[in-house]
């Protein structure tokens, strides 16, 4: 472990801010003579915080900035760049103070803020002292004082990220901070409730009850890893980072020991530039690698390695634990020699399968999805594979291939809500079992009682290096922690029963399931699941002619939020879809998209046949409204990728679902880049994204999503329906929207035949493991400019296939509020049911033969005619009345209810434009 000591030299430069009277003697005493200090869990009572103290701290920060601006210092403008960090910290503190103007007492009483300000004062004073003591050595780039300055810069970086995470937009939200890993979140909730920050000793004792800590030396090493801000406290933010780095929770400390304590490739508190400098020694030994915590994307690892052609690259693994990334990289020849050593640790022992998180569905939910011709387990993006992965912390579910494709297309955040993807968990959705209770089976065990190791003497800068070395030398392989308790969660969210329309009262929506599980096999497609009688086949009219290219313009957006019911029919939640006669299909686009060349499907394309129409990014118009387009690989659009929905279907519905709004165009651009991407980058380790030479912005994992885009213009809703979420709002949904689509599409359909089916659908899909830059210009929250894409005609058979996922996306996880100002849609868009495969194929065949059924072919009876006239006199359009009657099977009372529920008479958007 000599390499560990050498590589981390000076890593403790930030220390805890004190003089460290005990030093190594104190560390050894703590390791071998654990004693009991219950009397004072807090290391020291925090000072009083007022505006005067904050301003004093600002003066110290200003002094540090002036010292660092000395030209002789010649600081590199690469993260962590202290000349950016301190001004950013100052600016965010100003924002916090402005939010608490007149309420400074409230802010001063906030425990986290007091601890933060005290630590900021200490670290700025420590930096000033470093300049005084280091003198001329500060100007030597490789000197110890200069290394300590770099360490302090990292600490300032961590502090700023933490401050932004706990005070997003300047408002305290530490008590609602969302811990990414469900098991870790449950531990924190049980141990500390809604506390934002706890003393290290309290944290250590609570953690020991779940993950036994073998010695005081191990406790000290653990503290040096988890206490990113070096203040003797552990915040919920730091805990979230640690549990993401060393996932899974069930073997947390075992993973930490294998990756941070004993692994020669681990680098504590190293920067991007320092990793490059270190690997330069092994430039002629391809496969040499080291890894560190990413300072700009806290909670993720950055792996630096030497390529076969003598380059040094740094990558960030995606959607997998570090040990899995290292194993995969070793197998593929990328990560062979940790820190240049010939012996590479075997990490396969960490790959023990975790207990599967089985999501079970109740009988009612099963029947509801059958009514829609779908199943809960079907991925609502591709409508082909079963869901097998859960995005954290938002909780949305999808299949791995869709998530991978989305990320490779440079999609930002979660495809559904744009919340930052802090982690993923494999899940399994079980088919309905009539004998099951529908509840989740959890398992767990209690750990040993907590020892009370004391570690008061941990303040000296480099003691942690000695401690890590000693711990590594004596470390034996530890068993996995018995604790694998996942939080209790209710059942997956589903829409309401249509047959309960009249008698059902509002009920709270159930939540998305959180927890860990092994990956599901995604090819079965519920062939072993008994289904009730499938829905009646509803045939779609023939597709539009394939002879004209689709034109994209910049028409004015309609004033209503469209429903995600069909690719081209997206009316408001509160209104039945109108039947426009001339509105082109691009009127829903938020901004013009450049025309793209026509291409033909490539039969060998791996995505040939994949229904990327169901990616739901671009709301299209009805086929009857669309200009026919050339038959090219089509790019679909699921509206819910752009429209955050407000169904209370997950644990964060409510106060925590105030995610920022996203422009549809950002999703469109990401999906476009998926459909027509440039040639893939040189092959790099799979599932990883790279780092550029310099990170220029600081990511801030927070309780809110990071993907903040400019909100799209909202369409006001004149209807004053209440914002009921989930069940009550969808009582007509389960069978409604396909019928609505059929009527509307037939109203103006053309009688051309066209080849249909999934075989003619293809999108370019890039290969395994591209690496993106860790340059923060490419961060999660900045959408890429649109990549020219291949747009294709959507045949009506495609639309029947696409219906599998339109609108049901938000049933798969976390909803979010899509609100701003006075133009907030009062309800989320209505979903559109999908067809089961048999129905889809039958419909496809019938379309090929040009045979369609017309549900409104017969003329209404005289009684119906009089009712229709009466409704028209009230302001309803004839098309809306006809659609409502078909949906209600000519039940005039139900049709009236539908009209009242969905149609706003006064809305100007009700008239086709």
Swiss-Prot record:
Residues 430-460, 476-613, 647-727, 750-787, 814-863 are annotated as: Disordered. Residues 1-355 are annotated as: Sufficient for interaction with EPHB1. Ca(2+) binds at residues 227, 229, 231, 233, 238. Residues 509-521, 750-770 have a biased composition (Polar residues). It is found in: Cytoplasm; Cell membrane; Cell projection, Cilium; Golgi apparatus. PROSITE patterns: CBL_PTB, UBA, ZF_RING_1, ZF_RING_2. The modification Phosphoserine is found at residues 437, 450, 481, 617, 640, 666-667, 692, 907. The keyword Ubl conjugation applies. Its main location: cytoplasm. The modification Phosphotyrosine is found at residues 369, 672, 698, 737, 780. It catalyses: S-ubiquitinyl-[E2 ubiquitin-conjugating enzyme]-L-cysteine + [acceptor protein]-L-lysine = [E2 ubiquitin-conjugating enzyme]-L-cysteine + N(6)-ubiquitinyl-[acceptor protein]-L-lysine. Residues 646-913 are annotated as: Interaction with CD2AP. Forms homodimers; IFT20 promotes the formation of stable homodimers. Interacts (phosphorylated) with PIK3R1. Interacts with phosphorylated LAT2. Associates with NCK via its SH3 domain. The phosphorylated C-terminus interacts with CD2AP via its second SH3 domain. Binds to UBE2L3. Interacts with adapters SLA, SLA2 and with the phosphorylated C-terminus of SH2B2. Interacts with EGFR, SYK and ZAP70 via the highly conserved Cbl-N region. Interacts with FGR. Also interacts with BLK, SORBS1 and INPPL1/SHIP2. Interacts with CBLB. Interacts with TEK/TIE2 (tyrosine phosphorylated). It is linked to Can be converted to an oncogenic protein by deletions or mutations that disturb its ability to down-regulate RTKs. This protein has one functional calcium-binding site. This is E3 ubiquitin-protein ligase CBL. It comes from Mus musculus. The gene is Cbl.
């Amino acid at each position: 472990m000599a390499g560990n000591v050498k590589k981390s030299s000076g890593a403790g430069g930030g220390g805890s801010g004190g003089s460290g009277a005990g030093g190594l003697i104190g560390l050894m005493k703590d390791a071998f003579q654990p004693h009991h200090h219950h009397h004072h869990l807090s290391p020291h009572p925090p000072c009083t915080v007022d505006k005067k103290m904050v301003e004093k701290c600002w003066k110290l920060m200003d002094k540090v900035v002036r010292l660092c601006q000395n030209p002789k210092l010649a600081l590199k403008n690469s993260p962590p760049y202290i000349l950016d960090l301190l001004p950013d910290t100052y600016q965010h503190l100003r924002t916090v103070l402005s939010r608490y103007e007149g309420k400074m007492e409230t802010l001063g009483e906030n425990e986290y803020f007091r601890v933060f300000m005290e630590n900021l004062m200490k670290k700025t004073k420590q930096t000033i002292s470093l300049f005084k003591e280091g003198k001329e050595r500060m100007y030597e780039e490789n000197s110890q004082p200069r290394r300590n300055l770099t360490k302090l810069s990292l600490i300032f970086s961590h502090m700023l990220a933490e401050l932004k995470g706990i005070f997003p937009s300047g408002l305290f939200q530490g008590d609602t901070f969302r811990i990414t890993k469900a098991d870790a979140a449950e531990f924190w909730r049980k141990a500390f409730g809604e506390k934002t920050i706890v003393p290290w000793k309290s944290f250590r004792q609570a953690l020991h009850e779940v993950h036994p800590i073998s010695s005081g030396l191990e406790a000290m090493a653990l503290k040096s890893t988890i206490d990113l801000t070096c203040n003797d406290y552990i915040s919920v933010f730091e805990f979230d980072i640690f549990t993401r780095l060393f996932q899974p929770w069930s073997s947390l400390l075992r993973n930490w020991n294998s990756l941070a304590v004993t692994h020669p490739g681990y680098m504590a508190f190293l920067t991007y530039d320092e990793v490059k400098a270190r690997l330069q020694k092994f430039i002629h030994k391809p496969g040499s690698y080291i890894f560190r915590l990413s300072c700009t994307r806290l909670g993720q690892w950055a792996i630096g390695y030497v390529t076969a052609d003598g380059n040094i690259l740094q990558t960030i693994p995606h959607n997998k634990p570090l040990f899995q990334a290292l194993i995969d990289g070793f197998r593929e020849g990328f990560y062979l020699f940790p820190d240049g050593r010939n012996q590479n640790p075997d990490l396969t022992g960490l790959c023990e399968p975790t207990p599967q998180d089985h999501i079970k569905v109740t009988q009612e939910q099963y029947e509801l999805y059958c009514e829609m011709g779908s199943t809960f387990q079907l991925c609502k993006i591709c409508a082909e594979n079963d869901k097998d992965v859960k995005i954290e912390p938002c909780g949305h579910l999808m299949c791995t291939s869709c998530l991978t494709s989305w990320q490779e297309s440079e999609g930002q955040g979660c495809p559904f809500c744009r919340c930052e993807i802090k982690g993923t968990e494999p899940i399994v959705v079980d088919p309905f079992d009539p004998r099951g209770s529908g509840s989740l089976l959890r398992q767990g065990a209690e750990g040993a009682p907590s020892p009370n190791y004391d570690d008061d003497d941990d303040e000296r800068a480099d003691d942690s290096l000695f401690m890590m070395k000693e711990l590594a030398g004596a470390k034996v392989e530890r068993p996995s922690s018995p604790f694998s308790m996942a939080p209790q969660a209710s059942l997956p969210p589903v829409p309401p029963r249509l047959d309960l329309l009249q008698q059902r009262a509002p009920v709270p929506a159930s939540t998305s399931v959180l927890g860990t599980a092994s990956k599901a096999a995604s090819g079965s497609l519920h062939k072993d699941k008994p289904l009730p009688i499938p829905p009646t086949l509803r045939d779609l009219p023939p597709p539009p002619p394939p002879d004209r290219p689709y034109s994209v313009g910049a028409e004015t957006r309609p004033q209503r939020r469209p429903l995600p019911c069909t690719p081209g029919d997206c009316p408001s939640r509160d209104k039945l879809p109108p039947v426009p006669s001339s509105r082109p299909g691009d009127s829903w686009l938020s901004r013009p998209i450049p025309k793209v060349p026509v291409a033909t499907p490539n039969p060998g394309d791996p995505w040939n046949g994949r229904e990327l129409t169901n990616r739901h990014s671009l709301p299209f118009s009805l086929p009857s409204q669309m200009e026919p387009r050339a038959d090219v690989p089509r790019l679909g659009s699921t509206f819910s990728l752009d429209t955050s929905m407000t169904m209370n279907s997950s644990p964060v519905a409510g106060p925590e679902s105030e995610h920022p709004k996203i422009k549809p165009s950002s999703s469109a651009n990401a999906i476009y880049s998926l459909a027509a991407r440039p040639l893939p980058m040189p092959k790099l380790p799979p599932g990883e994204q790279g780092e550029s030479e310099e990170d220029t912005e600081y990511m801030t994992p927070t309780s809110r999503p990071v993907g903040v885009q400019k909100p799209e213009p909202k369409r006001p809703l004149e209807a004053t329906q209440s914002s009921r979420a989930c069940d009550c709002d969808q009582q007509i949904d389960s069978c409604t929207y396909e019928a609505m689509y059929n009527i509307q599409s037939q109203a103006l359909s053309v009688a051309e035949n066209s080849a249909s089916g999934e075989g003619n659908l293809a999108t370019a899909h890039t290969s395994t493991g591209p690496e993106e830059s860790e340059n923060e210009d490419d961060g999660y929250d900045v959408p890429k400019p649109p990549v020219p894409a291949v747009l294709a005609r959507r045949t009506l058979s495609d639309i029947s296939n696409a219906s599998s996922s339109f609108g049901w996306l938000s049933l798969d996880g976390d909803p979010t509020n899509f609100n701003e100002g006075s133009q907030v849609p009062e309800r989320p868009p209505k979903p559109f049911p999908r067809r089961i495969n048999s129905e889809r194929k039958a419909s496809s065949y019938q379309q090929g033969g040009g045979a369609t059924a017309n549900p409104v072919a017969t003329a209404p009876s005289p009684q119906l005619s009089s009712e229709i006239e009466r409704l028209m006199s009230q302001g309803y359009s004839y098309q809306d009345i006809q659609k409502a009657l078909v949906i209600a099977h000519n039940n005039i009372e139900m049709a009236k209810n539908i009209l009242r529920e969905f149609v706003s008479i006064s809305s100007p958007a009700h008239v086709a434009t």
